């Protein structure tokens, strides 16, 4: 199971769905964002 877009994630785990990455611009609130 992966974390969808705008879902909460942890930057030290690769838990976002394919095509997304964990963005921590406002730590500790990290969310999955589109790679594009």
Curated annotation (Swiss-Prot):
One Pfam family here: Toxin_7
A GO term, aspect molecular function: sodium channel regulator activity
Keyword ATP-binding: no
PTM sites of type Asparagine amide: 36
Gene Ontology CC: extracellular region; host cell presynaptic membrane
SS bond list: 2-17, 9-22, 16-32, 24-30
Chief site of localization: secreted
PROSITE patterns: MU_AGATOXIN (PS60015)
Tissue and organ expression note: Expressed by the venom gland.
Subcellular localization(s) per the UniProt record: Secreted
Entry coiled-coil feature ranges: none
InterPro entries recorded: Beta/delta-agatoxin_fam
Record SUPFAM superfamilies: omega toxin-like
Keywords, ordered alphabetically: Amidation, Disulfide bond, Ion channel impairing toxin, Knottin, Neurotoxin, Presynaptic neurotoxin, Secreted, Toxin, Voltage-gated sodium channel impairing toxin
Domain notes for this protein: The presence of a 'disulfide through disulfide knot' structurally defines this protein as a knottin.
Record family assignment: Belongs to the neurotoxin 07 (Beta/delta-agtx) family. 04 (aga-5) subfamily.
Function field: Insecticidal neurotoxin that induces an irreversible spastic paralysis when injected into insects. Modifies presynaptic voltage-gated sodium channels (Nav), causing them to open at the normal resting potential of the nerve. This leads to spontaneous release of neurotransmitter and repetitive action potentials in motor neurons.
The name this protein goes by in its record: Mu-agatoxin-Aa1a
């Amino acid at each position: 199971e992966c974390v969808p877009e705008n879902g909460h994630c942890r930057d030290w785990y690769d838990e976002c769905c394919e095509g997304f990455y964990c963005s921590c611009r406002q730590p500790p609130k990290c969310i999955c964002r589109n790679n594009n």
